[in-house]
Amino acid sequence: MAADKPHMNLAVIGHIDHGKSTFVGRLMYDAGAVPAHVIEKYKEEAKQKGKESFAFAWVMDSLKEERERGITIDIAHKRFDTDKYYFTVVDCPGHRDFVKNMITGASQADAAVLVVAAPDGVMAQTKEHIFLSRTLGINQLIVAINKMDAVEYSEKRYKEVVEQVSGILKMIGFKPGDIPFVPTSAFYGDNVVNHSEKTPWYKGVTMMEALNNLKVPEKPSTLPLRIPVEDAYTISGIGTVPVGRVETGTMKKGDKVVFMPGGAAGEVKSIEMHHEEIPQALPGDNIGWNVRGIGKADVRRGDVCGHTDNPPKVADTFVGQIVVLQHPSAITAGYTPVFHAHTSQIACQLIELNKKLDPKSGQVKEENPTFLKAGDAAIVTIKPTKPMVIEPVKEIPQLGRFAIRDMGMTIAAGMCMSVKQK
């Protein structure tokens, strides 16, 4: 049963049309997660639309509109098992305007598979996705050099693409030697579960073996307790019940906790998960909990619960390292977009542009730049317009990452380097 196996969240990233959905469809199909009759139905539908090669991808693209356009939009959660783990696939779309989905999707992932099409090699989004997944704290990567059937399973072409991808990985601090590269054809299933006869020159692992070789990230239960509040309910006979996912630390009945930035504190009376009372909550648990003396007015979405002896940090200002993904013009000091961090969404002002960095190496390119534009990486000083909890990424990574949104798009992704507390 899947519950006995460790669970991993897997992001699938890469440039549009490089075969991500087909790849995920194939993984699930070969892992026995998709009934054969469903695949047959998709094949038939795809054939009628003249897109026969899309059959497996249709397992993932269950949204009608996407089928018509032939692309994947929202993040789809799919599940499959290997011998060792059970995986939830966080399928990250490839279109440019979907970088926000990538930010919310990738940050839930423990590992990523980068899909690069052999005929095209590295494209703009291949780079952006590698970079973003690194920014968002994904440290385990597997690279699938896909569509090998389209280059007649050429070892020479495979090596060229491996070389291209390795170059980018090195620039941002991955060690290419530690990362498995697998030549695949998701459509035909080469090297996904079984070694392919068409690549006799390839002696490495199959995709399934590479997935089994991933390491389970350690649960951050030794870090200070942090539970971002998603919502708070009033339940008759119990009182106010905040709900949220434990990001770090552990919480037991009887613990003294505080909700920041408001500062309301009390003793934990009960903890519930899946409608059952539990004695303690661990990282990853989605819980509801009741705290003595806390009323509906004391707690709201975006607050963070922690122990009173190590409360969540409330920033007067904080220093962030950001990557500007897109902006119609330029960003200057004084810019006040909305910051999305854990469950909070708060307008914050960039009060100072401290340094412009080379996005590839992290080296300082310019001190106190006058503006930032798409593609730039920078260190900036940020002032929230109202009290906000954020933690340095080195101390509590789960509460140190943020996305900057404005004009209906993701402007930048970033992480908090230091906090000046209120």
From Swiss-Prot:
Top-level EC class: hydrolase
Residues annotated to bind GTP: 14-21, 91-95, 146-149
Region named G4: 146-149
Record-linked CDD domains: EF1_alpha (cd01883), EF1_alpha_II (cd03693), EF1_alpha_III (cd03705)
Reactions that this protein is recorded to catalyse: GTP + H2O = GDP + phosphate + H(+)
Location of region: G3: 91-94
Keywords: Cytoplasm, Elongation factor, GTP-binding, Hydrolase, Magnesium, Metal-binding, Nucleotide-binding, Protein biosynthesis
EC number: 3.6.5.3
Residues involved in Mg(2+) binding: S21
Family from the record: Belongs to the TRAFAC class translation factor GTPase superfamily. Classic translation factor GTPase family. EF-Tu/EF-1A subfamily.
Designated name of the protein: Elongation factor 1-alpha
Organism: Methanosarcina barkeri (strain Fusaro / DSM 804)
